[in-house]
Design a protein with these regions (language model features):
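N-terminal beta-strand-loop-alpha-helix module at the start
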Residues: 2-47
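Structural motif
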Residues: 5, 97-98
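Structural beta-sheet core signal
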Residues: 8, 44-46, 67, 101, ...
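Gly/Ser/Thr-rich loops at beta-strand to alpha-helix junctions
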Residues: 49-50, 104-110
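A glycine-rich helix N-cap at a beta->alpha junction
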Residues: 51-88
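Glycine-rich phosphate-binding loop signature in dinucleotide/nucleotide-binding domains
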Residues: 89-97
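Short Gly/Thr/Asp-enriched flexible loops that form oxyanion-binding sites at enzyme active sites
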Residues: 107-125
Length: 249
């Protein structure tokens, strides 16, 4: 048994298909594998709208499931998403040793979010992991897919890993009756922008307006002229045009 803790970064696809429905829970399955094989407990984290789909995290044995949901954070790109997730991880009371994500997103193969999380946390990142070969209290050993080869690497903790869609689970990973029963007494924990420090939130959404849940960046802001000022402006422009015409004559 290792005195370690893992975190699964979960994001369900906007539109579920036969191809991506199972892939999105690969981080869950990986963390359950860690729990069954090494007795490493884990939590789940997502930046998305609340959905009952996330209750599946508890079915797989997660201790806690956090969903960061706030209108201030809606519509964020991958870089800002990674920054928010990383800030939550760094500000939480738990030190995670292994942070697990997945290679695919709604837009195809990407490592932008997990690599961004690793970058903001200033910790190692292993991309496109195909197999977990070994794990000790000090290091993680795995194989990742290069464009033409499979490379075996090792990393110290903490580390962020991104699972390839060809990841090889040693056996079928599924919810246990024990975890499913306990899941009934667990609730998804909603995290709002109030959790984060004010200066961080302001750095994420500088000069923005929120209209119908969408963020609009303010490029320039000025007051509308009054009717009186508008008439004066029109008079000035008219006189200027007359002077220009006179000078041309």
């Amino acid at each position: 048994d290792y005195n370690m803790r893992a975190l699964a970064l979960i994001r369900f696809p906007i539109e579920k298909t036969v191809d991506n429905e199972d892939f999105c829970i690969y981080p869950l399955k990986f963390c359950k594998l860690l729990k069954e094989k090494y007795n490493i407990n884990f939590d789940c984290l997502s930046l998305s709208k609340y959905s009952s789909n996330y209750s599946i995290c508890y079915d797989y044995g997660a201790d806690k499931t956090y969903i960061i949901e706030d209108v201030k954070f809606s519509g964020m790109d991958t870089n800002m998403t990674a920054k928010i997730l990383a800030n939550f991880i760094s500000e939480s009371d738990i030190n995670y040793d292994i942070i697990v994500s997945f290679i695919l997103s709604d837009y195809g193969e990407t490592a932008h979010v997990p690599s961004g999380v690793a970058s903001y946390l200033n910790i190692p990142f292993v991309y496109a992991v195909k197999q977990l070969t070994d794990l000790t209290e000090k290091e993680l050993f795995c194989k990742y897919i290069n464009p033409s080869t499979v490379v075996e690497v090792r990393s110290t903790y903490p580390v962020v890993i991104s699972l390839h869609y060809q990841f090889e689970f040693p056996y079928n990973i599924a919810p246990s009756l024990f975890d499913v029963y306990n899941a009934k007494n667990k609730e998804i924990i909603n995290i709002s922008s109030a959790f984060f420090k004010r200066d961080f939130v302001e750095s994420i959404i500088p000069k923005t307006q929120i209209i119908d849940g969408k963020i609009n960046t303010i490029i320039k802001q000025s007051s509308l002229p009054s009717k009186k000022n508008a008439n004066i402006q029109e008079t000035i422009e008219m006189l200027s045009n007359l002077i220009l015409k006179r000078d041309k004559l």
